Amino acid sequence: MLPRNATDKIQGNVSKPCFWKSLSPGQNWKSKSMRSFPEEFVKSTPGAFEHRVVFSVRWGNSWQLWLEREEKDLFMIEEDWDEFVDDNHLGPNDNVFFRHDDKMFLEVQIFKNDGNEIIDAPPEVEPETEPFHPTTPKNSHKETTTASASASASEFSDNWRETHGCADIKNPELYLLNPKNPYFVKTLTKGNDVLYVPKTVIKKYGLKFGPHLSPMHYLLPGDKINGSTKIYGGGSAPCFNGWVDLCRKYNLKTGDSMVCELERSGELVTAVRVHFINKT
């Protein structure tokens, strides 16, 4: 556990609601008590955490965790929390700091007992590919649609998957509308609802984003999906929400790949043009 003066120093620079998690004797990171939110934290963020929460870390990864209530206590779903623990290799010498950022979003920092912060992804974690979880967990909140709308969406997505593939993309620059635009290849893995721009791409093209919550768009053939820009990690981890809506609409699955072409207005990135790759 970090010394009290170290936690006070870190927490003293934070104006938003926050809390710490570290192990007590007899606990492990997958103990049920580690999945709960402090009561004071929940009270200080009324309405922010109804059905799910999104954790973001400094190296660009994020995790969506569904929530459940037991009487007055709020817990993260066991499967989702365990995935976060495993992905970050949390151990007995780790201290995790959670800070409320906006609505259901939390910024997460991991510190060792010596006070050093973990700022790089574990070897097994790919910081430039955020995961997408296409299924809804048991007992989680479910959005409702009319029968006709549901059938129409299902027919549309099934037809799309018949004509598009997700094999490794060679020569992605050939798919760009403007060869001078920044781009990257996105492959879906497991568990998130925002689109991160790889830090290597940001650095290569000198990209700028924002301001926080400013509108942006996903551009597809004959379609436009609205989203917004999110800025985390002091500006070092920009991302776009609305990505989960695109994934659901086009029935995207784990392993699907596409080319993401970034459109700029002035100096700022304001749109992502998504190129699906036809089967050969």
Swiss-Prot record:
Residues 20-114, 183-276 bind DNA. Its main location: nucleus. GO terms for cellular component: nucleus. InterPro entries: B3_DNA-bd, DNA-bd_pseudobarrel_sf, Plant_B3_domain. It comes from the Eukaryota. Keywords: DNA-binding, Nucleus, Repeat, Transcription, Transcription regulation. It is found in: Nucleus. GO terms for molecular function: DNA binding. Residues 122-153 are annotated as: Disordered. PANTHER family: B3 DOMAIN-CONTAINING (PTHR31920), TF-B3 DOMAIN-CONTAINING PROTEIN (PTHR31920:SF125). This is B3 domain-containing protein At5g25470. The lineage of its organism: Eukaryota, Viridiplantae, Streptophyta, Embryophyta, Tracheophyta.
